[in-house]
């Protein structure tokens, strides 16, 4: 499949080191003891880690600022401050991390066990116990903690969609992907609203599925008519196809045949992929009758009816997509 890109920019900061402590030993029988100030704790690191079941960057928002915790200051009795908690940023496999300032790629995380420290936390300052000498028996100073660092980063994810939405222009693909995911595709009542692949993520507690709404298919796409080659290349490596058919239109029966024929003409493997036939616009006049006719004609196919207008069948469709992804 032509690789689709998802990207966002974030600002990350590692934690400051805690300050060293100025303290002197004070005991019942030793009121003028020596220095015993402990060291400050280390600031938290910024760590990027691949999480196996993530399929998108949707855990984060574009422009979000994220920071590790600062180290705690040192204490008396030579006690060191606690280290700051690391900031762990979970990303999907195939995520590249770029420095916004230079445009250079800093890290590439490809595999499920990949992990990288992007920024080290600041070192904790030394307590005054370290500065005692023969000439300075009561040092009344300690080191401040080292400051953490900040980076403006761009995360870029190479995506191969799990599900491809297949349908004629205005079949309702953009509206469907907006309904079943958090995505908002541009919707208008004319052909080729979707000029470029548009991605959404179906989220569940155990898995995410990436769904691609790509430019509408028309007859002759396999010969390059319309956005043909571009469209077919985008869906060639998806695991599941959703054939979206407008059953309120006059040509609903021929739409299925054209979709199958165009996919087969481009790549014989496309027409044999796991698929669901989804009859859309059941809320419109005559659509229910056409839907029943379509089901009778397509014995052996998974055929579901939906209405994006009133959400009829949407939950059933989402459940079926997750079920198919596990087969």
Curated annotation (Swiss-Prot):
Q: What EC number(s) would the UniProt record show?
A: 3.6.5.-
Q: Could you tell me which residue ranges the Obg domain spans?
A: 2-160
Coiled-coil intervals: none
Quick one: a GO biological-process term for this protein? Answer: ribosome biogenesis
Q: Which cellular components does GO assign to this protein? A: cytoplasm
Q: Where is the signal peptide?
A: none
Where, per UniProt, does this protein localize? Cytoplasm
What are the binding positions for Mg(2+) in this chain? 174, 194
Specify which residues bind GTP according to the UniProt entry for this protein.
Answer: 167-174, 192-196, 213-216, 280-283, 307-309
Q: Where is the OBG-type G domain?
A: 161-326
Q: Which UniProt keywords apply?
A: Cytoplasm, GTP-binding, Hydrolase, Magnesium, Metal-binding, Nucleotide-binding
* Needed co-factor(s): Mg(2+)
What's the top EC group for this one? hydrolase
Q: Which InterPro entries match?
A: G_OBG, GTP-bd, GTP-bd_Obg/CgtA, GTP1-OBG_CS, GTP1_OBG_dom, GTP1_OBG_dom_sf, OBG_GTPase, P-loop_NTPase
A GO molecular-function descriptor = GTPase activity
Assembly and interactions?
Monomer.
Family to which the UniProt record says this protein belongs: Belongs to the TRAFAC class OBG-HflX-like GTPase superfamily. OBG GTPase family.
The entry's function note states: An essential GTPase which binds GTP, GDP and possibly (p)ppGpp with moderate affinity, with high nucleotide exchange rates and a fairly low GTP hydrolysis rate. Plays a role in control of the cell cycle, stress response, ribosome biogenesis and in those bacteria that undergo differentiation, in morphogenesis control.
What HAMAP family would the database entry show?
Answer: GTPase_Obg
NCBIfam families for the chain = Obg_CgtA (TIGR02729), PRK12299.1 (NF008956)
Q: Would you tell me the protein name for this molecule?
A: GTPase Obg
- To which species is this protein native? Borrelia hermsii (strain HS1 / DAH)
Annotated gene:
obg
